[in-house]
């Protein structure tokens, strides 16, 4: 049976936030990447088969309202904490993808006891001990998205052979907002590694074996600093794991969320 998604909005801290939601079960909040998100992903559907999945669209990304006061990733995290409180979703699990992993990690440090489980997939947010996070200012946004795939064919599988004008505008707006909230330092926080040890919830950090955007050392550092974390590497994928191997990724996360 197809998963039916509802789309709507809520207000948190005086800011309109757009949401997608589907499924039943324990609540799972998915935080999307710095390139925004497609409205339909097999990965989302697979998680919604077992969980109440909530996907907020980051403020200022794509055509979502862009509040003037949101100037950093921690601002987004504070806003989302307020959103969860308003939705009665205390104790939800967080799944952060790339840039969304940074937001999820910040949220976890704010209320460590108010979290069921934490999943970070190729997370940004910490300075890699070796290597650098790919600077999207140095290449076009199309090249940046392509760099997220290990298999070049996966780009067309997800976005089609011809990119629409609306998709290009979407990426342009996402890039603009990323530069506002994560420019200096680029895509990491100096404070986050020092705050992660306070997060006691079980955590899973997943790294694509061929990630060309976030070095594996960043995921390793997150797993090292989180006191109850395990690190897994997925073969045959790059940074955009949820689009290259959606069902395999969903299976790993579902098993982790269900584990004792």
Give residue ranges: language-model regions.
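Short beta-strand/loop motif that positions the catalytic acidic residue
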Residues: 199, 205-207, 211
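Flexible "cap/lid" loop of the alpha/beta hydrolase fold
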Residues: 102-110, 115-147
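Conserved HGGG/HGGXW glycine-rich cap/lid loop of the alpha/beta-hydrolase fold
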Residues: 11-65
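Conserved alpha/beta-hydrolase catalytic His-Asp/Glu region
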Residues: 129-135, 142-200
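Catalytic active-site module of serine/aspartate enzymes centered on a nucleophile-bearing elbow/loop
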Residues: 229-260
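Conserved alpha/beta-hydrolase "acid-adjacent" motif
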Residues: 212-218
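Active-site loop/oxyanion-hole signature of alpha/beta-hydrolase fold enzymes
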Residues: 54-95, 251
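Conserved alpha/beta-hydrolase "nucleophile elbow" surrounding the catalytic nucleophile
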Residues: 92, 96-101, 208
């Amino acid at each position: 049976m197809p998963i039916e998604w509802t789309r709507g909005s809520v207000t948190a801290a005086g800011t309109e936030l757009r949401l997608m939601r589907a499924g039943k079960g324990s609540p799972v909040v998915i935080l999307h990447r710095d390139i925004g998100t497609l409205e339909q992903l097999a990965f989302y559907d697979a998680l919604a088969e077992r969980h109440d999945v909530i996907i907020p669209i980051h403020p200022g990304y794509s055509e979502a309202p862009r509040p003037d006061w949101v100037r950093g990733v921690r601002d987004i995290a504070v806003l989302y904490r307020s959103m969860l409180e308003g939705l009665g979703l205390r104790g939800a699990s967080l799944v952060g993808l790339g840039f969304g992993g940074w937001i999820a990690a910040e949220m976890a440090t704010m209320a460590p006891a108010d979290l069921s489980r934490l999943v970070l997939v190729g997370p940004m947010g910490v300075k890699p001990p070796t290597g650098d996070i790919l600077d999207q200012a140095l290449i076009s946004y199309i090249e940046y998205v392509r760099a997220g795939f290990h298999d070049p064919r996966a780009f067309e599988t997800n976005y089609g052979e011809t990119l629409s004008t609306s998709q290009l505008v979407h990426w342009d707006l996402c890039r603009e907002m990323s530069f506002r909230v994560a420019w200096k330092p680029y895509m990491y926080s100096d404070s986050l590694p020092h705050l992660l040890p306070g997060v006691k919830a079980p955590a899973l950090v997943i790294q694509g074996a061929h990630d060309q955007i976030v070095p594996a050392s960043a995921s390793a550092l997150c797993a090292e600093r989180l006191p109850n974390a395990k690190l897994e590497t997925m073969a045959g994928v790059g940074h955009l794991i949820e689009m290259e191997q959606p069902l395999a990724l969903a299976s790993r996360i579902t098993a982790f969320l269900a584990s004792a």
